[in-house]
Amino acid sequence: MKHFTYRGDKAREISFPLGGLGSGCLGLGGTGQLVDWEILNRPAKGSRNGFSHFAVKAEVGGRVLDARVLQGDATPPFSGEGMAPFTGFGFGAPRETMGGLPHFRRTEFRGGFPFAEIRFRDPKFPGQVSLTAFNPFIPHNERDSSIPAAFFTITIRNNGRRTIDYTAAFTVRNPASGGTVNRLRTVDGMHVLQLSGGAGPDDPGYGDFALATDAGGVAAQEYWYRGRHFDNLGVYWQDFSAPGPLPPRAYETPGQADHATLSARVRVPAGGEAAVRFVFTWNVPHCRNYWKEQKECCGEGKTCPPPTWKNYYATLFPDAAASAVYSLREWDRLENETRLFRNALFGSTLPAPVLDAVSANLSILKSPTCLRLEDGSFYGWEGCHADSGCCEGSCTHVWNYAYALPFLFPALERSLRELDYRYNLGPDGGMPFRLQLPLGSERSGFRPCVDGQLGGVLKVYREWKVAGDTEWLRRLWPDVRRSIEFAWSPDNDDRWDPDGTGVIHGRQHHTLDTELFGPNAWLTGFYLAALKAGAAMADACGDPETAASYRAIFERGRKWVGRNLFNGEYFIQQIDLKDRRILEAFRGEGAGVAGEAWAVPAGEYWSEEHGELKYQIGEGCGIDQVLAQWHADLIGLGDIFDRKQTRKALRAIYRRNFHRSMRDVANPCRLYCLDDEAGTVMFSWPPGRKRPAIPVPYAQETMHGFEYQAAGHLILNGMVEEGVAMVKAVRDRYDGYRRNPWNEMECGSNYARSMASYALLNAFSGLRFDMVMREIGFRPVPTRDGRFRCFWSLAAAWGEIEIGPREAVLRVIRGELSIRRMTLPWSGAGSVTVMLRGRRLPCRRRGGVFDFGVDVTIPEGAALRVAASR
């Protein structure tokens, strides 16, 4: 795991998120500090929770050999942070960094999500210390993967020649509002230090917290010393660094943000090792829409507090103590199952940058970007501002790219589809792309976007094929059909395709936050893919006439795009930038932009100075021009565009948009790539091609989700070296020194679109699936030794696939997989032997297709073995 190890300055930007799915998180810093306390139902980037930290000490015969805070050297800035009086810039590094107390000289951070490990070394400390941290991440187990907790194990190895008594301590400042109360409890032999405040359980601001251990030799200090100036930290360190257990301290009256410490003492013989487990849990049950002012009317002249809803985790656990006890009681199972996933993922024979990208961006699911609503449904921001979510509403045109959730937690992805069609679909078939909270709020007033609305059709198709649940599809189909037919509806003010040509000509809102006018392969591709997917779903739902209609429109559009939008090298936008009349059709009803603060008023799409339409692509080479084909390849939909044209376009994206150094690239937009860093820009205009005076926004940026999809699409089409180079360019930028490896940015931190990286896994394995027909297949990228191993996951099960020149093993680690047919990358027609749990199965072979004739069920823990002759 050398590739995922960070030392020295390469650990300075690390904040490794520890928390549940939609439950909030806190961050483990690169040298051991606890940062980014995002546990109060909103982001809190850069936050510290007082003097919260871990510490260790070593004693022999009543004499303290050494005591240290369990972290490394403080990281810049050393002159101070922020502008607060007496503590900001000019007052030195914040005391809360714990940099003023003895700490370890060297640290080494090893990250392989969902686990992080830090190794601490100091010549003065008699022992080798490590801290391992995780939160359960178990595919398909949404409940245990949503526990609001951070799990920590401190392991100490005595490498000396005498027995040593070690103490491991965990300190947390009580973050509850109101007068804070800290109380130690014992539950079934587990020690729980519960932190609460003055608010009642039904108060919208209520929260309680707990730190707990199942270790022996426990001592607790419920309260640090209450004093002035620097008294509390100073007295604490005197107490901890003295021989023996921490002295207890209690106060009869509630305090304000009191610290509490829980410790455990272990005796370790020479050459021995001991571990102490701690868990920190939180319970902040009540959510509200803090980003928009909402007040319920209680009668004339009166207002009520904003409406609230509960976090999903609050329906599982009554308080933080309950989740702490559950976490400790189930720790072994939760850790073992998380390690099963981690080992399967990291056992994949993928290039290191690809494995890095896939694994690191799974952490987005554990960040404050994600929420789970009271019934367990999933909801997502686009990303995070420093102290609030960024861009609300499970934004469909952003979450289109996020491929992790539908394969790892497919039930949660299906909940996104269900909420979208239930709450966003309008009477005319149009769908706003942002879901409003609380559920049932008035729909967004902004116009539908092409990629978001029609991408939703592709996602319904994907979820249907991943799970094989046609009954689920039938329930959604009437709404899905209405959303497709909105394209030619007379009620569509944007006039996407009023004549049913298969090509979108009208006003086209999209994920780059503006409108295109005129046909382009990028957005028309979504339309074509939705028509093709819609036809297949219509057939499955007993609607053959609709299916035939969709296919006819699809074929017309596909032919037109190939003939009119491909310039011989790549796909362009067909538009006369000098024709102001294009805008005239959209000045009437529906031309407004209410609901999106950043949106461009209709009258501002014309530049008088340049005599041109603004925010268009024209003859540019766009990174997303064949995006719909990427989706289609991943979900088994087949060709949307001419395959030869698609491959030429992909080669053009690599040749024109990928830069090995950004030093000489002019970028007036946001800076995600600097100096000699490599990256792939959104658009380029090759020599001889007309560049709009004011092109589409973000044109020169390097946005990672787009980079990943382009890279994955190259890999899917055999351009593996080029695709890996693009992936490596992104991950090299997140090296721990310049940026946090577990926080990819776009419109904010922990950005959802970066989960396009998960699709790299399926691209390398060549995963093919149709659980409706009980089919699974793999066509992996060839390796030097002809052997390939990779993690896979579908709705019913997850596991590993191993493929060699003439043998393959399909292993189910969790769940149960029923298949009738399997495809492998083998040619020929030789004999085949298929074994399951020691029993040979009948099988008919046609080249690389192995047909079992009946459903074959691979149970949990079993493997299907296929051996073929030449």
Question: Where in the sequence are the language-model features?
Answer:
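Acidic/polar, glycine-enriched structural segments that form the non-catalytic walls/loops
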Residues: 5-8, 14, 117, 122-130, ...
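Aromatic-rich carbohydrate-recognition surfaces in CAZymes
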Residues: 55-59, 65, 76-88, 158, ...
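Beta-strand-rich N-terminal accessory domains
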Residues: 1-79, 345, 358-361, 365-368, ...
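The feature captures the catalytic groove of carbohydrate-active enzymes
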Residues: 143, 151-153, 221-225, 234-237, ...
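Short, solvent-exposed loop/turn and secondary-structure capping segments
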Residues: 17, 26-30, 36-40, 50, ...
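Active-site core of glycosidic bond-cleaving carbohydrate-active enzymes
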Residues: 386-430, 478, 514, 525-540, ...
